[in-house]
Regions:
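Amphipathic terminal alpha-helices
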Residues: 2, 290-302
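N-terminal Rossmann NAD(P)H-binding glycine-rich loop of SDR-like oxidoreductase domains
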Residues: 8-27
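Rossmann-fold cofactor-recognition segment
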Residues: 45-56
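NAD(P)H-binding glycine-rich loop region in Rossmannoid oxidoreductase-like domains
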Residues: 54-93
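Conserved Rossmann-fold NAD(P)-dependent oxidoreductase catalytic core, especially the SDR/UDP-sugar
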Residues: 72-74, 99-140
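Short-chain dehydrogenase/reductase
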Residues: 91, 139-147, 180-184, 209-210, ...
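NAD(P)-dependent short-chain dehydrogenase/reductase
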Residues: 128, 151-209, 213-217, 221, ...
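C-terminal "lid/loop" region of Rossmann-like NAD(P)-dependent oxidoreductases
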Residues: 199-205, 231-233, 241-248, 255-270, ...
């Protein structure tokens, strides 16, 4: 019989970050339980997947009590960008789930390490570097939900002495990234030689903070193991990347001799995440970058 160091629950365990984190914990002898909406064909061998309704407090509570996890990472949030027709319902549902999770650990006084996820969209687009002391200024209703969730966590953290942190994540990609996002779309357009679609993206001259998802997940992993209990930490690349540089890199990598007209690099409003506190507190280092993620995406069948 295998001996495990600790037990961890990961919601949304079949998403990009859930898969990467599950692998990390399995490699380090953790017993991993994945709470999912439905069991997919692609899953990891050593993860115990449980179809779970996170909106049902009673059902959720019973499963958490039974497992008695040392760590709980909540990744299972609907992205309203893909559910525009159901945005209000989606955000209300997302908040109910967060509240259920926090309420369980508050009521039962369980000293589990809790990690919630935040977004760069919680901050104003000002072209500057965002740090943990920057005031929230939501860009959209999704960001408002994230801020509301963080504030509720903080309220309960102070009252019930929870070990809880909001990990604020900036853009990060890998081969597991949802194909509707920008970098996977670019890789797909290049592989399918859809240069008109590529040109449209090129002329938007987008820039922002982009990382390899494995780096971001390694930071979350280190946070999960840390004895420290910060209120929030930023996980980002700490630098600005221009999407046009990624496009040109992938075109060159694919031996496609096509050039779009050079454009002036405008002063874009997208902000950059200052990850210095996370690096210091967790001894976290970035070992990869977004170009490596893009290269990996172009090599797989999308």
């Amino acid at each position: 019989m295998k001996k495990y160091k600790k037990k961890i629950i990961i919601t949304g365990a079949l998403g990009q970050d859930g898969l990467i984190l599950s692998k990390l914990f399995i490699e380090n002898k953790f017993k991993v339980f994945g709470f999912v909406k439905k069991i997919k064909k692609y899953k990891l061998k050593n993860v115990k997947y449980l179809k779970t309704s996170l909106t049902n407090f009673s059902t959720l509570s019973k499963k958490i009590k039974y497992i008695n996890p040392d760590i709980f990472i909540h990744l299972g949030t609907d992205n309203p960008n893909f559910l525009e027709t159901k945005k209000k319902y989606s955000l209300k549902k997302n908040y109910k789930i967060i509240k259920n999770i926090i309420d369980f650990f508050s009521i039962n006084k369980v000293k589990t390490k809790i990690i919630l996820i935040g977004s760069s969209q919680m901050y104003k687009k000002n072209g500057l570097k965002i740090n943990v002391n920057t005031n929230f200024k939501p860009q959209n209703s999704y960001a408002k939900f994230r801020i509301k969730s963080h504030k509720y966590m903080m309220k309960c953290k102070k009252r019930f002495n929870l070990n809880a942190t909001t990990a604020i994540l900036f853009n990060h990609d890998s081969i597991f990234r949802n194909k509707k996002f920008l970098i996977p779309r670019i890789a797909k357009f290049i592989k399918q030689k859809k240069f008109n679609e590529l040109k449209k993206i090129f002329f938007e001259n987008i820039s922002g903070d982009f990382s390899h998802a494995e780096d971001i997940c390694k930071g979350i992993y280190k946070l999960a193991l840390s004895k420290k209990n910060p209120n929030k930490l930023i996980f980002s690349s700490n630098k600005r990347t221009f999407i046009n540089d990624i496009i040109n890199y992938l075109l060159n990598l694919s031996s496609i001799k096509i050039k779009f007209a050079k454009m002036k690099r405008k002063k874009y409003l997208s902000s950059i995440g200052n990850n210095s506190l996370a690096r210091k507190e967790l001894n976290w280092k970035l070992k990869k970058n977004i170009l490596i993620a893009a290269k990996e995406l172009i090599k797989i069948n999308i």
